[in-house]
UniProtKB/Swiss-Prot annotation:
The gene is nuoC. Signal peptide: none annotated. This is NADH-quinone oxidoreductase subunit C. Its main location: membrane. Gene3D superfamilies: NADH:ubiquinone oxidoreductase, 30kDa subunit. It is a peripheral membrane protein. One of its GO terms (cellular component) is plasma membrane. It comes from Agrobacterium fabrum (strain C58 / ATCC 33970) (Agrobacterium tumefaciens (strain C58)). It catalyses: a quinone + NADH + 5 H(+)(in) = a quinol + NAD(+) + 4 H(+)(out). It is found in: Cell inner membrane. Keywords: Cell inner membrane, Cell membrane, Membrane, NAD, Quinone, Translocase, Transport, Ubiquinone. Pfam families: Complex1_30kDa. Belongs to the complex I 30 kDa subunit family. SUPFAM superfamilies: Nqo5-like.
Amino acid sequence: MSEALNDLAAYVKEARGSLVVSADIAYGELTLNTTPENVIALLTFLRDDVQCGFVNIIDICGVDWPQREKRFDVVYHLLSPRQNLRVRIKLQVAEDEGVPSSTPVYMGAEWFEREAWDMYGIPFEGHKDLRRILTDYGFEGHPLRKDFPVTGFVEVRYDDVLKRVLYEPVELKQEFRNFDFLSPWEGTEYVLPGDEKAKQ
């Protein structure tokens, strides 16, 4: 498998090296790093080239790195059924930077891009229907961002008396607690009975 991935990485670099910033193989998958300006050209090449044949888009997701200047990674997962290979395309974008929509290349990318917009707030330029897909109407914020509060901003519940859904500010019934998960069986400073032989 890694030989096929090495061959694919070398082929893509040779054929379209200007579109690829770097290529790595980790955990049995090839990752091609690119830029927002080059992502559509790279996706089109990977789909249309006879040697590649990545005709299926499996997923598009985001990764939030709030400490970085380019806060988000946008990650595309592609599949080539003919070669039985997967490839990951990754690019970095700032919080206020858009990514060209990949829907002209892969029709199946539409809902994946809507999900990345809904969860992270990553805008996909040229997407024809970029609206929330998982959260409720009027939802504020993007819940998979690292700076989004764990409790959220509002609590949604159904009221049996009023026979409708109510949106109320979050009211915590107890303070946040900090649990100490250290095991009493790990990290001891003293030698346990029977272990003194192992140290010799």
